[in-house]
UniProtKB/Swiss-Prot annotation:
Molecular function via GO: ATP binding; dTMP kinase activity
Alphabetic keyword roster: ATP-binding, Kinase, Nucleotide biosynthesis, Nucleotide-binding, Transferase
GO CC term (a single one): cytoplasm
Name recorded for this polypeptide: Probable thymidylate kinase
Similarity comment: family membership: Belongs to the thymidylate kinase family.
Catalytic activity: dTMP + ATP = dTDP + ADP
Residues noted as binding ATP in the record, renumbered to the chain: 10-17
EC identifiers of the protein: 2.7.4.9
Gene3D superfamilies linked to this entry: P-loop containing nucleotide triphosphate hydrolases
A GO biological-process term: dUDP biosynthetic process
Organism: Methanosarcina mazei (strain ATCC BAA-159 / DSM 3647 / Goe1 / Go1 / JCM 11833 / OCM 88) (Methanosarcina frisia)
């Protein structure tokens, strides 16, 4: 039986990575032995290229192809084999981040960049079975990012507002897959809600 793919999405500063760690540490979820991963990948040739691009002024189209190459490698080496072996996979960021973020960075290049980026993935990506969208006002998110230290080029209010709008468009188009979480709520409350829903989903399919 094929495993299921669960993804966590949201703008920078939404708190999703913190929740991802809590999910990984949760003993009730650990019982089911899911595979935990992230995008961009860490410690890989493609993932390192993406991280370097984020920290530089790489051309937006070149940047998209680096992200997409990392996604393809991630699918081939980890996600697809794990799912084929019946493992459930939980990923901190996945393809929806690319649609939402590069759907903004490429606005000057294409009439409908979000759809164009999605079309690049048609036929070969794996669509998640469940996606949590950590929704939050960009002002709050940027304030959180500032507390972490130096900001990246993606952590600007106007930019993140456009990314947030793209995420909400994606969620509205696929309500059966997306669970929108109010990430402005206290961190502990958000963690408990998401962990509860992840556990219920895994128990239901096991």
């Amino acid at each position: 039986m094929r495993g299921k793919l669960i993804t966590l999405e949201g703008i920078d500063g939404s708190g999703k990575s913190t929740v991802a760690k809590k999910i990984q540490e949760n003993p009730e979820i650990q019982v089911f032995d899911p595979v935990f991963t992230r995008e961009p990948t860490r410690g890989t040739l493609t993932g390192t290229a993406v991280e370097n691009a984020i920290q530089s002024e790489t051309d937006q189209l070149a940047e998209l192809f680096l992200f997409t190459a990392d996604h393809a490698e991630h699918l081939a080496k980890l996600v697809k084999p794990a799912l084929a072996n019946g493992k459930n996979v939980i990923s901190d960021r996945y393809s929806d981040s690319r649609y939402a973020y590069q759907g903004v960075t490429l606005k000057s290049r294409f009439e409908n960049p979000l759809e164009w980026v999605r079309s690049l993935h048609s036929g070969w990506t794996v669509v998640p079975d469940l996606t949590f969208l950590f929704d939050i006002e960009p002002e709050i998110a940027v304030e959180r990012c500032g507390k972490r230290g130096e900001q990246t080029k993606f952590e600007k209010i106007e930019f993140l507002q456009n990314v947030r709008e793209n995420f909400l468009i994606l969620a509205a188009e696929d309500p059966g897959r997306f669970v929108v979480i109010d990430a402005s709520r206290p961190q502990e409350e958000v963690e408990k809600k998401v962990i509860k829903k992840v556990l219920e989903f895994i128990q239901r399919i096991s």
